[in-house]
Amino acid sequence: MLLEKLNSATSKIKLIEEKLQDINLIKDQKKYSKIIKEYTYLEKINTKKIEYEKILSQINDTKTILEKEDQQEMKELIKQELIDLDKKKEDLEHQIKILLLPQDENDSKNIIIEIRAGTGGEEAALFANNLYSMYIKYSEKKKWKTEIINFNETELGGFKEIIFEIKGKDVFKKLKYESGVHRVQRIPITESNGRLQTSAATVAVLPNIEETEIDINEKDLRIDVYRSSGAGGQHVNTTDSAVRITHLPTGIVVQCQNERSQHKNKDQAMKILRARLYEFEDSKKQEQRSSNRKQQVGSGDRSERIRTYNFPQNRITDHRANITLYKLEEFMQGELDPLLDPLMIALQEQELKSNSI
């Protein structure tokens, strides 16, 4: 069964190789990049297929040798070799099944992250700032580039909302599971009685969508301009540079005032709008998928509580995979991989069960 799936996938390699011979293909960089990506993926599958066929052959050969062997001592050695080969086969099958999971076409895309303060007032806004700082530090470790698109700052330096872009290799693949409600438990600096408080911030991770990837009719947009305002300070000016765009069919509203010019703010607002419209359409598709899968795999829904940050205990718990680490301080400094790596594996395991590969 698994070998059939491998053969089916790798049968496309020759066809893609023929396409890559077409000199006109390079003129269309977008199409060329897409085909190269598919070719690279299929080559990975082909490598695993060769490994798998080799180990199946080794198992068969070893079984044949065992049947012909008369000496008991040699039989025991051969049996142990079979046990080792079966273990290798099992591990390889697991790797192959994960490789054969449906590929997310957005994995290689840059992202837009929106962080909003939730319940908890000023403390929630300060936590939103902490999360922003955490993702920036993680991006620096990964050599990714970041840029603020828009923010709404509080008097104490928290964020009611901050929207920023991260550019780099496999950014969406690495951070797509961050969407959801992040809950914090700590004693706020605003709390004079020293009582533990629970607050929350919402994170949305959206793939950065190019203009050519989504059609937006200008007639469906209402564009308003107004004067920048807020506690943000340095970029706020007295001209009508801030832009608010309303997508009339969906009611989605985006605004941007971070840039000095109206033109740049409009470009940034359109970038956010494309991402949100894509998410809107994608969420409709998700609703059509089986309820079984939605129960087992983190849906990426921004209303789903995904993680708790407990500062007194130096504890971070991801509720989707029941992963707990007592390294919260390091985590907030951008050391995310000790949690993100096992989380991705756990969610892939859940997806394997729901896909029955």
Swiss-Prot record:
Molecular function via GO: translation release factor activity, codon specific
Keyword Acetylation attached: no
SMART domains in UniProt: PCRF (SM00937)
Pfam family for this entry, one: PCRF
Keyword check for Nucleus: no
Alphabetized UniProt keyword annotations: Cytoplasm, Methylation, Protein biosynthesis
Compartments, record wording: Cytoplasm
PTM summary: Methylated by PrmC. Methylation increases the termination efficiency of RF1.
Modified residues (N5-methylglutamine): Q234
Chain intervals for the UniProt region annotation (Disordered): 283-313
Known function: Peptide chain release factor 1 directs the termination of translation in response to the peptide chain termination codons UAG and UAA.
Family as reported in the entry's similarity comment: Belongs to the prokaryotic/mitochondrial release factor family.
Name the UniProt record assigns to this protein: Peptide chain release factor 1
Organism: Borreliella burgdorferi (strain ATCC 35210 / DSM 4680 / CIP 102532 / B31)
